[in-house]
Each structure stands twice: as C-alpha cells, then as structure tokens.
Amino acid sequence: MRYINLLILTLVITVSAIGQQSLKAGAAAPDFNGESLDGKVFNLNQLQGKIVVLTFWSTRCEICHNEIPKLNEVVKRYRDKDVVFLALTMENQVKVEPYLRKNPFSFSILPNSFGVFLKYADMDKGGNINMGFPSYFLINQHGAITLKSDGWDKTSRLDSQIQQMLASE
C-alpha cells in the first residue's frame, strides 16, 4: 500500500509539473497566499498597484546570510514607498526563528512557503525543480515579473530596477 501511495504521489507531482513553464520577465506573477511570522496574511493579487519584491531564501544558504544585510538597506530606502518586500522560505517557524534572532530581517518572513516555491521555481526537461538561493522576483504594479535573478550580489540591480519603476509612475 505504501508503494502505491508513493507511486500516485509521484505521478501527481510529475503530471502537474509537466505543464509548468519557466517564469520569465514579462510573465504574470503567479498568485499566492502566505502568512508571515507576525500573523499577517499576504495575497499577491491584493498587492496590485504596489511593487513587490519576493526573496526566496534558506537558513542554510551562506549567500543568503551575506545578502540579507544588503537587502535590509534596500528595504529601508523604500519604507515610505509603495514597495512590499517578502522573504519566503520552505522552512518552518521553529527552524526560522532562532536564525532570525541572530540575523534579523527588516521585512516580512513567510515560512512554510513550499507551495509558492513550486509556483516560482524553474523545471528542467527531466522534471527536476530548480531555484538558486537567494532568488529574487521583482513584480511591477500590474502583477508582471520585471526581474528574475538569483545568487550573489544582486541587491544593487534590484535597487536600480525599483528606482526605475518608481520614476516611471
């Protein structure tokens, strides 16, 4: 019975993944719901009219650890603007909270975001899910992805893109 359940689960994941395309700049950002550590509920569609920055990260990611202070500085620059920063992790609250005590974020953390991760991750022809950490998605006021980037030292590019988007309003 356990084997059959595993087989069914594998088929469901594979079939749902076959239709998934890699998200590119210009594509509509997939909607999602998520709850932050402080209990605030976020829905991407309800953030229409605002610039949204999604950061996918992990407590085990050394690059993430080094990038968060830089990203916190970017967040401070746009605190009074219509820019929403969300940090999404697949890890649960129990895992994330001790990390945050030593490495604070100045924006909302959404734990348990595996479902959102699946919507935003790339999939190769073999059906493997791929996303580097940290990954950044910049979403414009109309819900379209304007920047998709991952890895080391991307915050200056992110900052520049946000400035351009705000200037064109």
What are these regions (language model features)?
Residues 5-15:
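Bacterial N-terminal signal peptides
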Residues 102-105, 112-163:
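Thiol/disulfide oxidoreductase modules built on the thioredoxin-like
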Residues 43-62:
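Short active-site neighborhood of thiol/selenol oxidoreductases, capturing the structured segment around
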Residues 65-105, 116-124:
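Structural microenvironment flanking redox-active thiols in thiol-disulfide oxidoreductases
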Residues 29, 165-169:
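Non-globular targeting/processing and membrane-anchoring segments
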Residues 53-54, 85, 136:
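Hydrophobic beta-strand anchors of alpha/beta hydrolase catalytic cores
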Residues 18-44:
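N-terminal "domain-start" segment that seeds a small globular fold
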